[in-house]
């Protein structure tokens, strides 16, 4: 023990100086460099100790892999980026996201042949004049051909119908060649469910155009049509049935259609069907197929869901109903379309909203554009249609009270290239599932949520075409419009604005209650100030320079008498205001009739200011466009 202590003291006394330690470190580094160079030349030398200690200690698994490489892969240099790969794996998925983006960029191809489609389908595409696939088609076609149950999510007008119909037709032809399956009466192999009759007709029309070359038979069964012709069509050999859930269930109940051979199921506009009460019908249709869903190979069936929007509630419902389904989304899902311009017109409330609509609509019609005017209610739609008819503007209607056959006729008139009825006045019934060539979408009534906004704007700028969206923003809609504009400027998804069914009352609290104001919006105090200043850090909804706020206390004076007896001062202050300077303006504003066009347009010419997120502002843009 004494000798050990003496040796320890000797070592402490003979500790090397800092200069000596620096020399030893340089010698060690030189040895490391020499050993590494020799290892690169011979490719069999093991890593030196300094190299091993310079990085993290290798695991036992890595050492075994290195020994196997040295034994069986002589002459192959060791993979240098291994430490970086290990760090990437420990980093929490940052590298995985980059790899996914790179893979998605590689999947976007320039021709349909690279997607694995056959000659018959390619001939049908050539007849339709389509040569280059869209992003959703590049993502969806290979997935459906591989037999995967998927949810295809992409913005409206991106080609989702062809994204599932093209591979579906090829799968039907493959089953005929490999499994000997053929057409049978009342036993379709593919079923496409759609929420509306109009979307059913659209999908059926595309399927018919493909069937001219692919040689398969499809039929359409939808509500609002006679049942007898549909029964006769189902009693003939059929491959695919396109229809609405309720009518298909009726035919199954009556024995006109059976489940036996169904292998492929498509739910078009799936978010609409789950969000608008089609859930029970879909569950009833899926009940006999649940047992077959878990069977492997050709005994099961494949499900494809197509949607333009997806709230978290609907996504959760889909994941519960379809276990193991894969979600495939494009980069533009639930975002603005790059080829569409969005303008917002702030209305203070004193203007005539119908006259503002006329001022926006007339220049667009003068350019030969086809325009859709969206309203929130039937009464609003009737009022707009009556007003435009009085001003010699030809219109057609599309809402719930218009009979189904008349709606089809109105759509044909609107599609007519001669332009006899270039204006379609409609409700949200026309916001989904209609493939129309629309140049301009005007929102007379601003929607109550961003999902409806996306569907309305999806009627224009379809398949890469240019379009324009103009929104008349009332005071109660300012906050939601501001948030939508901010999200579009940042190219963010609009789904977050409708989480848990957010409506205007929840998004816009400063108009339902005078207490408190939102942090995202700076509203000028309502006590007698002249203008409404609507400013955010990124929003460009324009200031309204009217003097409506100056007149608002006088209009609300009778309310002060009835609501509170102690507020006699506002009533007395109204008497001297008759002789004050603002009185002539008040007198001019009250007798102004709403039906007159002359004075209203002169005043609106200085009030309407259009601001789009591309930076084009001022009233000139409203007149120029």
Swiss-Prot record:
Its EC number is 3.6.4.13. A motif (Q motif) lies at residues 110-138. It is an enzyme of class 3 (hydrolase). It comes from Oryza sativa subsp. japonica (Rice). The Q motif is unique to and characteristic of the DEAD box family of RNA helicases and controls ATP binding and hydrolysis. GO terms for molecular function: ATP binding; ATP hydrolysis activity; RNA binding; RNA helicase activity. Residues 36-51, 567-586 have a biased composition (Low complexity). This is DEAD-box ATP-dependent RNA helicase 39. A motif (DEAD box) lies at residues 268-271. Residues 591-600 have a biased composition (Basic and acidic residues). The lineage of its organism: Eukaryota, Viridiplantae, Streptophyta, Embryophyta, Tracheophyta. GO terms for biological process: mitochondrial large ribosomal subunit assembly. Belongs to the DEAD box helicase family. Residues 36-59, 72-103, 505-625 are annotated as: Disordered. It catalyses: ATP + H2O = ADP + phosphate + H(+). Residues 353-503 form the Helicase C-terminal domain. Residues 141-328 form the Helicase ATP-binding domain. Disulfide bonds: none annotated. GO terms for cellular component: mitochondrion. ATP binds at residues 154-161.
